[in-house]
Design a protein with these regions (language model features):
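Bacterial Sec-dependent N-terminal signal peptides
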Residues: 1-53
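Short linear motifs in intrinsically disordered
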Residues: 15, 445-448, 507, 580-585
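Composition- and surface-driven signal marking solvent-exposed, interaction-prone regions
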Residues: 30-34, 49, 358-359, 365-371, ...
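Mature catalytic domains of secreted/periplasmic carbohydrate-active enzymes
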Residues: 52-398, 541-634
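Acidic/polar, compositionally biased interaction segments
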Residues: 399-551
């Protein structure tokens, strides 16, 4: 399949000159031809230049694509809404740390929890295909969705048009009987929502999964990777072009790329084709296959990026999953404070967020998710001037040390990309477990520790295991099937019934995080070291686990710049009513105010710091909750 962009100008000129030559030679006298031909050439060339003026055609190579600037609208937008809504919204169930939209993959790889849930709720012989007629979307209202997203303060919307199960939310002729027009809602979801979103003044974007788990041409994750070519040529590329040419989204979010290089997906060709079709406002993300270091960056369930030359937006759900997961606990959901703080930190570091909602199968967005969006929108109504269109200040954030403690019954954790607990962050945290271990048998014990990233084990003040290095980070997109680290081993002889001091240290850098500790011996079957053999202190008569201390840095203050003004966003109200800003001496006449409250606040400059006196602010004058923005106006 030829994806090179044809040059129509040269063909047009050749045809025109040939026609003119024939016309002149047959019908126009020689002297008239000499005068007529140059005039026509000038007219033609002028017309061609004018037709091409202002539009650059990009070539299907990374050099050409990298010469294209990223559209300013995306850098300015800061907030987008992601929507995962498909057949997996019918069961809407997975493990507590799993993505609900990966339900089919769980069935395919033998996930007993998902398999047993489906059998119990839907029947012994029920298959994933049987969810299609149950996905009715009878309460779906595109105008209501768009209205909610606009009230949240979002500037763009990103709909999953097709996830890894191949089910399409538009009437794709490449997925007959497997799209929302043929089965389920019997509606063009992509078309209806695109229209409603644009009418509200927001940009419309579309997520598209490059591979599919269950396509007969190539079953991603099941078939051999070299079988993908026919799927790409006969299904993926024509379907991708069908989708994009029909709806012309301002943004494309591709996904599922990580098992193949970008050349397999013909990524450069598709991106160039898209840019030339849609024009300057078009933007793509960074998930196009190996070797394609291109597109706006999309960290997923992380603590964000600290600096990037390219635009970026953190993607995550309000809970642990993108698609609705009814097995999630309330504690898994972001509080309004969590959401505002997460958003502000991303903006201060030069990015933004694409926050996800997962509707029910009937098309209703859960009320808790709606409430969170409206709470964020209410905050933005007061403080939007510090957010939209802002850029980074010389000092993006200020941090403080945070920690929490608890008794952990055992070291058996798969945090995936989540925090082990508030206020500790998702990335760059440490944990230390201390206490006593009491073996059941006198034996030479083999201890095994598996961790992403580093882990060390001491027993009786002896270093038994030392894996103190960071694991290589994977792709941002491969979360659910990211490989586990290799276990480290160590031996030590222990006596039955004796309590030995034990200490385990752990650190996490970025992306996925887990920590496990096993033991085994000639008499002891391999198992996670159980709570019955772990003691937080010597006074414990019964095993209760180990004393755990989790630590990280946490942001307390963020900065942005907009229209020449500096904005200091405090994530906590100072207990002494003195807001301390680490910045240079402001110019004479500088005024500092609290957004949403009339009047200015007194300030002074001492020891290289601006100290703002907040005592004049009465509690009834606070314009918002969760974070407060102070404008430093020149």
């Amino acid at each position: 399949m030829n994806f090179l962009i044809a040059s129509h100008r040269s063909k047009k000129l050749a045809w025109f000159f040939a026609s003119c030559h024939y016309l002149c030679s047959e019908f126009i006298p020689f002297m008239q031809k000499l005068l007529f031909l140059p005039i026509l050439c000038i007219v033609l060339l002028t017309g061609t230049v004018q037709a091409q003026s202002g539009k650059i055609e990009y070539q299907p190579d990374w050099e050409s694509l990298n010469s294209r600037p990223y559209p300013q609208w995306f850098r300015d937008a800061k907030l987008g809404i992601f929507i995962h809504w498909s057949l997996s919204s019918v069961p809407a169930w997975s493990g507590k740390e799993q993505y609900g939209e990966w339900f089919l993959r769980g069935l395919m790889v033998g996930d007993t929890a998902r398999i047993n849930f489906q059998k119990r709720v839907f029947g012994e012989n029920f298959t994933y295909e049987d969810y299609a007629p149950l996905f009715k979307g009878e309460l779906f209202n595109a105008d209501e969705w768009a209205g909610l997203f606009a009230r949240s303060g979002a500037r763009y919307v990103l709909l999953v048009s097709k996830h890894h199960d191949g089910y399409c939310l538009w009437p794709s002729k490449y997925a007959p009987g497997w799209n929302t027009m043929d089965v389920g809602p019997h509606r063009d979801i992509v078309g209806e929502l695109s229209k409603a979103v644009r009418e509200k003044g927001m940009k419309m974007g579309l997520y598209y999964s490059l591979p599919e788990w269950n396509n007969k041409l190539y079953r991603w994750g099941t078939d051999k990777p070299d079988m993908v070519t026919r799927y790409v040529d006969e299904h993926m590329i024509p379907q991708f072009k069908e989708l994009i040419s029909t709806y012309k989204p301002s943004l494309i979010f591709s996904d599922g790329e990580w098992d193949h290089p970008a050349t397999t997906w013909h990524s450069a060709e598709l991106i160039a084709w898209y840019y030339n079709l849609v024009g300057d406002e078009a933007i793509v993300n960074d998930r196009w296959g190996g070797g394609a270091d291109y597109g706006y960056r999309t960290p997923e369930y992380s603590s964000g990026l600290s600096m990037s030359e390219r635009p970026w937006a953190e993607v995550r759900g309000l809970g642990r999953s993108f698609g609705l997961n009814r097995n999630e606990s309330l504690e898994a959901y972001m509080t309004p404070q969590d959401l505002v703080h997460f958003f502000v930190k991303s903006v201060a570091n030069g990015g933004g967020i694409t926050i996800n909602v997962g509707p029910y199968a009937d098309g209703q967005i859960p009320l808790l998710q709606q409430e969170r969006l409206l709470q964020l929108g209410g905050w933005l109504k007061v403080n939007g001037e510090a957010i939209y269109g802002s850029t980074m200040y010389a000092k993006a954030t200020e941090e403080k040390d945070v920690k929490f403690t608890r008794i952990d019954p055992e070291i058996n954790f798969d945090w995936v990309r989540n925090s082990p607990g508030k206020p500790v962050t998702e990335d760059n945290f440490t944990a230390t477990w201390t206490g006593y271990i009491q073996p059941r048998f006198t034996d030479n014990y083999l201890f095994e520790a598996q961790a992403d990233d580093g882990i060390r084990l001491w027993i009786d003040n002896k270093l038994v295991i030392n894996k103190w290095n960071a694991d290589a980070t994977g792709t941002q997109s491969n979360v659910m099937e990211a490989g586990k680290s290799i276990a480290k081993e160590g031996h030590i002889i222990l006596e039955a019934g004796k309590k030995y001091e034990i200490k385990v240290e752990y650190f996490e850098t970025q992306q996925n995080a887990h920590a496990y500790l096993w033991w085994s011996s000639a008499n002891q079957a391999k198992e996670i070291v159980p709570v019955s053999c772990l003691f937080a202190n010597l006074q414990s008569a019964k095993g209760n686990g180990l004393y755990a201390v989790y630590k990280s840095k946490a942001t307390r203050l963020c900065y942005t710049v907009n229209n020449g003004n500096i904005y200091a966003i405090s994530l906590e109200w100072p207990a002494d009513n003195n807001l301390v800003l680490n910045m240079k001496m402001p110019a004479a006449g500088t005024k500092i105010s609290l957004l949403g409250r009339p009047g200015n606040l007194p300030w002074r400059y001492e020891n290289g710091k601006v100290i703002v006196d907040l005592s004049p602010v009465k509690i009834v004058e606070l314009p918002c909750e969760w974070a407060w923005v102070f404008k430093v106006k020149k």
